[in-house]
Swiss-Prot record:
The name this protein goes by in its record: Glutathione synthetase
Originating gene: gshB
Keywords for the protein's UniProt record, in alphabetical order: ATP-binding, Glutathione biosynthesis, Ligase, Magnesium, Manganese, Metal-binding, Nucleotide-binding
Organism (species): Neisseria meningitidis serogroup B (strain ATCC BAA-335 / MC58)
Domain of life, per lineage: Bacteria
Domain ATP-grasp: 129-314
């Protein structure tokens, strides 16, 4: 019987009707696996050993239920991470210093024999915005800088751009700028904090009106359906957290080419689960911290993404 520890946000905060971590847990519980939960802030090192204040939990019913308690937890027990068959890091960004420290502890735990997914090293190496620079043939014209003057030059060259912080999530802090925007100066000052914060700028991709696509890669294999996240009217962000609407669709063409090119490289780097974001024919992000979209694809297309993930965890935990 597998013992799996989830490092995740408080379980009482889960929106069970759409939460991907919840879907993972449900599938593993169906298989009879023993499940445990901890917070990233409950990791510690004692006597050189990486441990967590972990609590075993079980489901109280067979259905998603946001209105009532859906789980029952036992008391927390300080447990070495190496005692679990798999440790799954599912804490949401931002990737701040606390997140960085957690990944460093996870790397130490891996050296002690723990099986961590995604690995601490992979999460540090793959900034979700900067990672696309490793795959330049799939991306739109892109600038990374701390200098607002560089952004102004880039804007003049392309006329219509998107700027975003490197540590955001859910569409937070993303702005669209055109040359005629009267607020260019104030937006750059706010986002770049007077040239002290590194940001990414990209040429605006007009296909965003049809949605950006979340493509999932699990254990080096491509999920055959993408989740198109379509912006609300008047929005430039398709993120579900920003009010976008998720529509599952079959993967094909350029989207499949991008996914199948990245899949073996992500596997080589120890990334069990990744979510690629694609707008039009352009790769815009590689999400490795806490990719979502499982439940939307499962409900709309009947493809069991959670089962595919659990299969991969079982296989990778004995590698």
């Amino acid at each position: 019987m597998m013992k799996v520890l989830f490092i995740a946000d408080p379980m009482a905060s889960f929106k069970t009707y759409k939460d991907t971590t919840y879907a993972m847990m449900r599938e593993m519980a169906k298989r009879g696996w023993r499940l445990f939960h901890t917070l990233s802030g409950e990791l510690s090192v004692n006597g050189g050993l990486v441990t967590a204040q972990a609590s075993a939990f079980e489901f109280l019913g067979a259905k998603n239920d946001d209105d009532h308690a859906w789980f029952k937890s036992a008391d927390k027990v300080q447990t070495a991470l190496e005692a679990f068959d798999a440790v799954i890091m599912r804490t949401d960004p931002p990737f701040d210093m606390q997140y960085l420290y957690a990944t460093q502890l996870l790397t130490l735990a891996e050296q002690q024999g723990a099986k961590v997914f995604n690995s601490g090293q992979a999460m540090r190496d793959f900034n979700e915005k900067l990672a696309i620079l490793n795959f330049s043939r799939f991306i739109a014209p892109t600038l990374v800088t701390t200098r607002s003057a560089d952004v102004r030059t880039f804007l003049k060259e392309h006329g219509d751009i998107i700027i975003k912080p490197l540590d955001g999530m859910g569409g937070m802090g993303i702005f669209r700028l055109t040359e005629k925007d009267p607020n260019i100066g104030s937006i750059l000052e706010t986002l770049m904090q007077l040239d002290s914060r590194t940001i990414m700028a990209q040429r605006y991709i007009p296909e965003i009106v049809h949605g950006d696509k979340r493509i999932l890669i699990i254990g080096g294999e491509v999920v055959p359906y993408a989740l198109a996240r379509i912006p609300q009217n008047g929005e430039t962000r398709g993120n579900l957290a920003a009010g976008g609407r998720g529509v599952a669709q079959e993967l094909g063409g350029r989207d499949r080419e991008i996914a199948e090119t990245l899949a073996p490289e992500l596997k080589r780097r120890g990334i069990l689960l990744a979510g690629l974001d694609v707008i039009g024919s352009n790769l815009t992000e590689v999400n490795v911290t806490s990719p979502t979209g499982f439940q939307e694809i499962m409900k709309q297309k009947g493809f069991d993404v959670a089962a595919m993930f659990a299969d991969a965890v079982a296989a990778w935990s004995v590698r």
